[in-house]
Amino acid sequence: MHSHFLYIFVVFSYFIHYNKRKRTGKTNLKRIRPGVREALPGVKVKERKSMEVLYKSTRGNGETVTASQAILKGLSDDGGLFVPTSIPALDVPMEKLAAMSYQEVAYEVMSRFLTDFTEDELKNCIANAYDAKFDTEEIAPLTKADGVYYLELFHGATIAFKDMALSILPHLMTTAAKKNGVKNEIVILTATSGDTGKAAMAGFADVPGTKIIVFYPKHGVSPIQEKQMVTQKGANTYVVGITGNFDDAQTAVKKMFNDHELAAELDQAGFQFSSANSINIGRLVPQIVYYVYAYASLVRDGRIKDGQEINV
């Protein structure tokens, strides 16, 4: 799990340093700790927006797929995670980013990674995700207390930060299915230690063409989290309590993904697996957005200068 957040922080850091380089004519990628090159070996850093960003497995499989294909598959056939073959640049002046709404920043960030989505497709996904389901128009406001700024990520439907990505993943996935001519019903398998399960079910509830099955450790979540999951409405939502811990649930889900015989049987029955866990690039890319938005908000409010480093 830590590697997923490391990836997000590295990409966010590169975005900020790229904007600094545009303004000053220089940047220092070595200051990104632990560093793009060290954290993502074999991944190139692009200094201009690429025409297309493809994805490959972290296990070295040479095959590449488009963003929409990576979102649909969730996990590579060799069991690795999908990562971009190059990191795109957020080549938008900070003064413009600072004046944008959350939805507009989301488009600028996500369009760099999800390059096979059209502008209309991506903007439609964003509009349907970040709407009245959030109890504030800012979506992710910044507040200050005792000299520390707090990025509020609890304004979504389930009051968990997972809502930030899981509100848009169903829309990305159904759009990806249409783009790739997928006729099968998509079965989302998700392991959770609490928050992800409820947020994922809330996001996918009654979404046409999908079903979602959440596995959680029977004695590893709080009573409130369990009640949230087992009372979730939706004709396509299912939840299963297992004997074991979260790692057991996650391992079982990955084994099902890697069972090619099971995949073939499902295909014959008109189904295919995908994931709503953070192994899916459709979860990771939306999570980059709120870091960029937070930084731009600090610049907008005059709290920091463009290019100034911050602790996150």
List each language-model region with its residue ranges.
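Short, Lys/Arg-enriched N-terminal segments with co-localized hydrophobic residues
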Residues: Y14-R23, K30, A39-S50
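PLP-dependent amino-acid enzyme catalytic core
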Residues: K46-V312
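Hydrophobic alpha-helical signal peptides and transmembrane signal-/tail-anchor segments
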Residues: M1-H17
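Short, basic/polar N-terminal leader/transit segment immediately after the initiator methionine
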Residues: S3-H4, K22, R31, V53-K56
